Amino acid sequence: MDYSQLMGFGPDGWGYDMLRATAMTMAVAFSGFTIGLVFGCLGAAASLSSSGALQAAASGYTTALRGIPDLLVIYLFYFGSSSVISNVASLFGSSGFVGASTFLIGALAIGVVSGAYQTQVLRGAVLALNKGEIEAGRAYGMGALLLFRRIVLPQAARYALPGVGNVWQLVLKESALISVIGLVELMRQAQVGSGSTRQPFSFYLTAAALYLLITFVSGQVFRLAETRSMRGLQRGV
Protein backbone atom coordinates (compact mmCIF):
# COMPACT_ATOMS: atom_id res chain seq x y z
CA MET A 1 0.00 0.00 0.00
CA ASP A 2 1.47 3.36 -1.03
CA TYR A 3 1.55 6.44 1.20
CA SER A 4 -1.49 8.15 -0.34
CA GLN A 5 -3.65 5.09 0.28
CA LEU A 6 -2.22 4.49 3.75
CA MET A 7 -2.96 8.04 4.90
CA GLY A 8 -6.09 8.43 2.81
CA PHE A 9 -9.71 8.46 3.93
CA GLY A 10 -10.80 5.27 2.23
CA PRO A 11 -11.81 2.02 3.93
CA ASP A 12 -8.17 0.97 4.39
CA GLY A 13 -6.77 4.42 5.08
CA TRP A 14 -5.73 5.83 8.43
CA GLY A 15 -6.50 9.46 7.65
CA TYR A 16 -9.54 9.78 9.91
CA ASP A 17 -7.74 8.03 12.76
CA MET A 18 -4.79 10.40 12.51
CA LEU A 19 -7.07 13.44 12.41
CA ARG A 20 -9.02 12.24 15.45
CA ALA A 21 -5.73 11.68 17.26
CA THR A 22 -4.61 15.19 16.28
CA ALA A 23 -7.81 16.62 17.77
CA MET A 24 -7.16 14.65 20.95
CA THR A 25 -3.62 16.02 21.11
CA MET A 26 -4.91 19.57 20.82
CA ALA A 27 -7.62 18.94 23.42
CA VAL A 28 -5.29 17.48 26.06
CA ALA A 29 -2.62 20.10 25.33
CA PHE A 30 -5.10 22.98 25.65
CA SER A 31 -6.57 21.49 28.83
CA GLY A 32 -3.12 21.04 30.34
CA PHE A 33 -2.07 24.53 29.27
CA THR A 34 -5.17 26.05 30.88
CA ILE A 35 -4.59 24.13 34.12
CA GLY A 36 -0.97 25.26 34.01
CA LEU A 37 -2.06 28.87 33.60
CA VAL A 38 -4.09 28.59 36.80
CA PHE A 39 -1.12 27.07 38.64
CA GLY A 40 1.13 29.72 37.11
CA CYS A 41 -1.06 32.58 38.34
CA LEU A 42 -1.18 31.09 41.83
CA GLY A 43 2.55 30.41 41.82
CA ALA A 44 3.41 33.90 40.59
CA ALA A 45 1.13 35.48 43.20
CA ALA A 46 2.77 33.38 45.92
CA SER A 47 6.30 34.20 44.78
CA LEU A 48 5.52 37.94 44.74
CA SER A 49 3.72 37.97 48.08
CA SER A 50 5.22 39.35 51.26
CA SER A 51 4.80 35.98 53.00
CA GLY A 52 8.01 34.03 53.34
CA ALA A 53 6.09 30.76 53.55
CA LEU A 54 4.28 31.42 50.26
CA GLN A 55 7.52 32.44 48.57
CA ALA A 56 9.18 29.24 49.79
CA ALA A 57 6.23 27.15 48.57
CA ALA A 58 6.36 28.76 45.12
CA SER A 59 10.12 28.29 44.91
CA GLY A 60 9.84 24.64 45.96
CA TYR A 61 7.09 24.01 43.41
CA THR A 62 9.00 25.47 40.47
CA THR A 63 12.29 23.85 41.49
CA ALA A 64 10.76 20.40 41.95
CA LEU A 65 8.65 20.35 38.80
CA ARG A 66 11.43 21.69 36.60
CA GLY A 67 13.84 19.14 38.07
CA ILE A 68 11.72 15.98 37.79
CA PRO A 69 11.44 14.41 34.30
CA ASP A 70 8.03 15.05 32.76
CA LEU A 71 7.53 11.36 32.00
CA LEU A 72 8.04 10.51 35.67
CA VAL A 73 5.46 13.12 36.67
CA ILE A 74 2.93 11.50 34.33
CA TYR A 75 3.63 8.06 35.82
CA LEU A 76 3.32 9.40 39.36
CA PHE A 77 -0.02 11.01 38.60
CA TYR A 78 -1.37 7.97 36.77
CA PHE A 79 -0.34 5.22 39.17
CA GLY A 80 -0.83 7.37 42.26
CA SER A 81 -4.38 8.38 41.37
CA SER A 82 -5.23 4.87 40.17
CA SER A 83 -3.99 3.42 43.47
CA VAL A 84 -6.18 5.84 45.42
CA ILE A 85 -9.21 5.00 43.26
CA SER A 86 -8.53 1.26 43.60
CA ASN A 87 -8.29 1.54 47.39
CA VAL A 88 -11.52 3.52 47.57
CA ALA A 89 -13.24 1.03 45.25
CA SER A 90 -12.09 -1.86 47.44
CA LEU A 91 -14.05 -0.35 50.31
CA PHE A 92 -17.19 -0.95 48.26
CA GLY A 93 -16.34 -4.54 47.38
CA SER A 94 -14.50 -3.97 44.12
CA SER A 95 -11.28 -5.90 43.59
CA GLY A 96 -8.36 -5.38 41.26
CA PHE A 97 -6.75 -2.34 39.70
CA VAL A 98 -9.05 0.55 38.73
CA GLY A 99 -7.46 2.95 36.28
CA ALA A 100 -8.13 6.68 36.28
CA SER A 101 -9.17 8.67 33.21
CA THR A 102 -6.09 8.92 31.01
CA PHE A 103 -7.26 12.24 29.54
CA LEU A 104 -7.78 13.79 32.96
CA ILE A 105 -4.51 12.45 34.35
CA GLY A 106 -2.59 13.56 31.28
CA ALA A 107 -4.06 17.06 31.38
CA LEU A 108 -3.36 17.39 35.11
CA ALA A 109 0.22 16.16 34.78
CA ILE A 110 0.95 18.52 31.89
CA GLY A 111 -0.79 21.32 33.74
CA VAL A 112 1.24 20.91 36.91
CA VAL A 113 4.51 20.77 34.94
CA SER A 114 3.71 23.71 32.66
CA GLY A 115 2.48 25.66 35.67
CA ALA A 116 6.03 25.71 37.03
CA TYR A 117 7.26 27.38 33.84
CA GLN A 118 4.29 29.72 33.64
CA THR A 119 4.96 30.79 37.22
CA GLN A 120 8.34 32.13 36.16
CA VAL A 121 6.93 33.76 33.02
CA LEU A 122 4.12 35.54 34.87
CA ARG A 123 6.38 36.56 37.74
CA GLY A 124 8.80 38.14 35.30
CA ALA A 125 5.96 39.93 33.52
CA VAL A 126 4.71 41.48 36.76
CA LEU A 127 8.23 42.55 37.77
CA ALA A 128 8.63 44.26 34.38
CA LEU A 129 5.61 46.52 34.95
CA ASN A 130 5.99 50.28 34.99
CA LYS A 131 5.82 51.00 38.70
CA GLY A 132 5.16 54.68 38.02
CA GLU A 133 1.83 53.88 36.37
CA ILE A 134 0.82 51.70 39.31
CA GLU A 135 1.65 54.47 41.78
CA ALA A 136 -0.23 56.97 39.60
CA GLY A 137 -3.29 54.70 39.64
CA ARG A 138 -3.16 54.48 43.42
CA ALA A 139 -2.78 58.25 43.69
CA TYR A 140 -5.79 58.64 41.41
CA GLY A 141 -7.81 56.63 43.91
CA MET A 142 -8.08 53.29 42.10
CA GLY A 143 -8.95 50.32 44.28
CA ALA A 144 -6.95 47.10 44.10
CA LEU A 145 -9.38 45.38 41.72
CA LEU A 146 -9.67 48.36 39.36
CA LEU A 147 -5.90 48.86 39.43
CA PHE A 148 -5.38 45.22 38.51
CA ARG A 149 -7.96 45.30 35.70
CA ARG A 150 -6.96 48.61 34.13
CA ILE A 151 -3.18 48.76 34.64
CA VAL A 152 -1.58 45.56 35.92
CA LEU A 153 -3.36 42.95 33.78
CA PRO A 154 -3.01 44.67 30.35
CA GLN A 155 0.68 45.38 30.85
CA ALA A 156 1.49 42.00 32.39
CA ALA A 157 -0.30 40.19 29.56
CA ARG A 158 1.76 42.14 27.01
CA TYR A 159 5.04 41.19 28.68
CA ALA A 160 3.97 37.59 29.31
CA LEU A 161 2.74 36.71 25.81
CA PRO A 162 6.13 35.70 24.30
CA GLY A 163 6.97 33.46 27.25
CA VAL A 164 3.48 31.99 27.43
CA GLY A 165 3.71 31.20 23.71
CA ASN A 166 6.94 29.31 24.32
CA VAL A 167 5.30 27.36 27.15
CA TRP A 168 2.43 26.42 24.80
CA GLN A 169 4.92 24.99 22.30
CA LEU A 170 6.51 23.03 25.14
CA VAL A 171 3.10 21.70 26.21
CA LEU A 172 2.40 20.49 22.67
CA LYS A 173 5.57 18.43 22.71
CA GLU A 174 4.93 17.16 26.24
CA SER A 175 1.52 15.88 25.15
CA ALA A 176 3.27 13.13 23.17
CA LEU A 177 4.45 11.61 26.47
CA ILE A 178 0.87 10.87 27.49
CA SER A 179 0.88 7.99 25.00
CA VAL A 180 2.63 5.89 27.67
CA ILE A 181 -0.57 5.74 29.77
CA GLY A 182 -2.74 4.70 26.82
CA LEU A 183 -4.43 7.92 25.70
CA VAL A 184 -4.89 7.68 21.93
CA GLU A 185 -3.42 11.01 20.92
CA LEU A 186 -1.23 11.61 17.88
CA MET A 187 1.87 9.74 19.06
CA ARG A 188 -0.12 6.77 20.35
CA GLN A 189 -2.08 6.55 17.10
CA ALA A 190 1.17 6.59 15.12
CA GLN A 191 2.46 3.72 17.27
CA VAL A 192 -0.74 1.71 16.76
CA GLY A 193 -0.77 2.34 13.02
CA SER A 194 2.89 1.48 12.55
CA GLY A 195 2.44 -1.74 14.51
CA SER A 196 -0.62 -2.76 12.49
CA THR A 197 0.79 -2.00 9.04
CA ARG A 198 4.51 -2.43 9.69
CA GLN A 199 5.14 0.92 8.05
CA PRO A 200 6.46 2.97 10.98
CA PHE A 201 8.22 5.60 8.89
CA SER A 202 5.01 6.66 7.15
CA PHE A 203 3.11 7.06 10.41
CA TYR A 204 5.85 8.85 12.31
CA LEU A 205 6.50 11.12 9.33
CA THR A 206 2.80 12.01 9.23
CA ALA A 207 2.76 12.59 12.98
CA ALA A 208 5.79 14.89 12.67
CA ALA A 209 4.10 16.85 9.88
CA LEU A 210 0.92 17.25 11.94
CA TYR A 211 2.88 18.39 15.01
CA LEU A 212 4.71 20.93 12.85
CA LEU A 213 1.40 22.15 11.42
CA ILE A 214 -0.09 22.66 14.88
CA THR A 215 3.10 24.39 16.03
CA PHE A 216 3.18 26.68 13.01
CA VAL A 217 -0.47 27.71 13.24
CA SER A 218 -0.35 28.28 17.00
CA GLY A 219 2.90 30.21 16.61
CA GLN A 220 1.22 32.52 14.12
CA VAL A 221 -1.70 33.03 16.50
CA PHE A 222 0.62 34.04 19.34
CA ARG A 223 2.62 36.28 17.01
CA LEU A 224 -0.58 38.02 15.95
CA ALA A 225 -1.61 38.42 19.59
CA GLU A 226 1.79 39.93 20.43
CA THR A 227 1.50 42.38 17.52
CA ARG A 228 -1.98 43.46 18.55
CA SER A 229 -0.92 43.88 22.17
CA MET A 230 1.86 46.25 21.11
CA ARG A 231 -0.30 48.53 18.95
CA GLY A 232 -1.25 50.97 21.67
CA LEU A 233 2.35 51.09 22.90
CA GLN A 234 3.66 51.77 19.39
CA ARG A 235 1.18 54.59 18.84
CA GLY A 236 2.23 56.15 22.09
CA VAL A 237 5.93 56.24 21.12
From Swiss-Prot:
It holds the Pfam family BPD_transp_1. CDD domains: TM_PBP2 (cd06261). GO terms for cellular component: ATP-binding cassette (ABC) transporter complex. Residues 22-222 form the ABC transmembrane type-1 domain. InterPro entries: AA_ABC_transptr_permease_3TM (IPR010065), ABC_transp_permease_HisMQ (IPR051613), MetI-like (IPR000515), MetI-like_sf (IPR035906). It is a multi-pass membrane protein. Induction: By octopine. The chain crosses the membrane at residues 26-46, 72-92, 96-116, 201-221. The keyword Transmembrane applies. It comes from the Bacteria. Its main location: membrane. Component of the octopine active transport system probably consisting of four subunits: Q, M, P and T. PANTHER family: ARGININE ABC TRANSPORTER PERMEASE PROTEIN ARTQ, CATIONIC AMINO ACID TRANSPORTER, MEMBRANE COMPONENT. Belongs to the binding-protein-dependent transport system permease family. HisMQ subfamily. This is Octopine transport system permease protein OccQ. The gene is occQ.
